[in-house]
């Protein structure tokens, strides 16, 4: 750790404090994540170290690069490439005007490329949200914190006792499914896509049941026809209110037909029928995709 000089605290992640830091030897600016684990007394589990070490192999232009893993005295530091801003802050700063459609399209396309790459290596994210999508001034967007959920679990609260958001969580997880797939990340990205377009969260639930019911009120309460097996999921209740599905043109009014078609496939109830990242990249919505540069106020 003596090779790094902390410049400033840039945030508080799910697992610990994040600092902007400088490598004293190379001058490289990095993001330093200090991982706080409940097992501080026993040290860092070897399984976590193994999982994290595998992530150093994930090299892709749309994945935030894990440069190094430093394990000292029961503490774990992850050294990542540094990016200037996250999508949440950028959307908040652009709340009045919104993001231009070509930029939304570019961001979604890049994020799907990153997902397709990770999914092809059988790595899931499980906790995608605008806060862990990082952007730079050149128009790139990258997925951060990939694979951390598998190494450390997804806590209910962060180390500062903030509630970990449910807004982007797939219905199969909310219904208690223990064995989920890459489709959970596609669901999260679908929610983020809608949020970029409408400038507000699609399903801003404040509890697991509120989260489910918000989804049901928009997409209709799922049954065996749309989602075979749903009624036998651990947390499914026959007493759930039966809501009808809303028209997508009312859910995301600014989106054209191609955009609505892609979004509805990303938000398919049945994870087996949900579009894959690879298939989504070939969707007609991306026929005219470009890479515009965002107006960042850094």
From Swiss-Prot:
The record marks 9, 88-89, 166 as: CDK7 binding. GO terms for cellular component: Cajal body; centrosome; chromosome, telomeric region; condensed chromosome; cyclin A1-CDK2 complex; cyclin A2-CDK2 complex; cyclin E1-CDK2 complex; cyclin E2-CDK2 complex. CDD domains: STKc_CDK2_3. Signal peptide: none annotated. It is an enzyme of class 2 (transferase). Its main location: cytoplasm. It is found in: Cytoplasm, Cytoskeleton, Microtubule organizing center, Centrosome; Nucleus, Cajal body; Cytoplasm; Endosome. The keyword Cell division applies. The modification N-acetylmethionine is found at residue 1. GO terms for molecular function: ATP binding; cyclin binding; cyclin-dependent protein kinase activity; cyclin-dependent protein serine/threonine kinase activity; kinase activity; magnesium ion binding; protein domain specific binding; protein kinase activity. Gene3D superfamilies: Phosphorylase Kinase, domain 1, Transferase(Phosphotransferase) domain 1. This is Cyclin-dependent kinase 2. It comes from Rattus norvegicus. The gene is Cdk2.
